[in-house]
Amino acid sequence: MKETHRFLIPDYFPQFACKMGACRAACCEGWPVSVSMADYFSLLGLDCAPALRARLDCGIHVVDNPTKEAYARFEPRYDGNCPMRLPDGRCALHAELGEDVLPHVCRLYPRGVRAEDGRFECSCANSCEAVLEMFLDRAEPITFLERELELKLPPLPQRRSVFETLGLAQKIRLHLIAIVQNRRLPLPQRLICLGGLMDRLDCALKNRDKALLEQILAEDPSELCPKLAEPEVGAEHLQFGLQIIEQMMEILDEGSQSIRDCGKAALAYFHGGKSGDIARYEAANAHFSAVFPQWETFFEHMLVNHMFFAQFPFQDRPESMHEEFVALCAVYAILRFLALGCMADRRDAEGLIDDMAAAFRLVDHTEFDRYASRLLKRLGCASSQEICDLIAL
């Protein structure tokens, strides 16, 4: 049954539409699709053609430790696609029986619905190429507005991790987004500002100091940042950052089907010289900046959309504010590394979109935020200067 609520949404949301069969890569490509117990038994009872029944019976399996929310899943085929995907790109379930029979996740994704304290939000994940295509040539910052929406909502899970926010979680999140949208500074410096602000917010929240918290949130982001951002970035810093992200990508590439192709392409480019080859980095950076002069605005939109979709820094996982900040820096570094390495001898916008969407399939469909800061620490990238080196790329 459809419900009507007032949602906070990004301004692009009303224009979003799934490309269906026209999608070059499905937003679930390379990953299993988890469905609830209710959806699983609903699929078992469908009255459908024998060919679709065979697809369902072979494609969906109960997981080893099922729960009501994650009871079974569609395992990807050898080519990374969902077993329900037809040769023309459409979903076999949707094509034969319509939208209403789809599991909740398939019907909504890449849309994500969030509800806390009576507030509803809805946005789209960056793992969808149609979302990123709206961002590539967009000049104006993403804004957020309230809109009444009628949606058939899934059962919304209870939070496993509860953070002290003094009732200001949404206001904190939007203030952090405003820091990333401060175009008076280059994007890496905005991230440095973000880290400094998050340290102050963390202190206020731990001390339950609501007056200090409200004072911080009342500050103008464009006035705050110049006081915080004074990074030291020379050739040796760039070389260190490049070496760290190369090592990180080698590890991620081994375990991620979604970024394997673009990860290998980027690593092959940078490994054409010695590890941390600044000359190859500078050549790729110059080429990328010339082909996509608006790249920084595009990256801003991707980070902002990711932060809103994931409820940064209050994702439902037991991570500290600092670890969430480091994870966001890791996301930025991965995007830059893939963009520069994969596009070093290319000029096609579709290729850039596909590589960025693949990166977000890794970020959105895994516990990336939980292991990113630990992985960087293991690789020797933990101090404030080392994080600055990482995002200077």
Predicted regions and their residues:
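Flexible, acidic/Gly-rich N-terminal and inter-domain linker regions that tether
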Residues: 1, 6, 14, 37-38, ...
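Immediate flanking context of iron-sulfur cluster ligation sites
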Residues: 3-23, 60-103, 120-122
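Short, compositionally biased low-complexity segments
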Residues: 15-22, 141, 238, 304-307
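Structured loops at beta-to-helix junctions and adjacent beta-edge loops in soluble globular domains
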Residues: 21, 31, 85, 94, ...
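Low-complexity, highly charged intrinsically disordered N-terminal segments
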Residues: 26, 30-59
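Internal, well-ordered alpha/beta segment that forms a basic, Gly-enriched binding/recognition surface
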Residues: 89, 97-196
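Hydrophobic, aromatic-lined core segments that form the binding pocket/scaffold
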Residues: 184-393
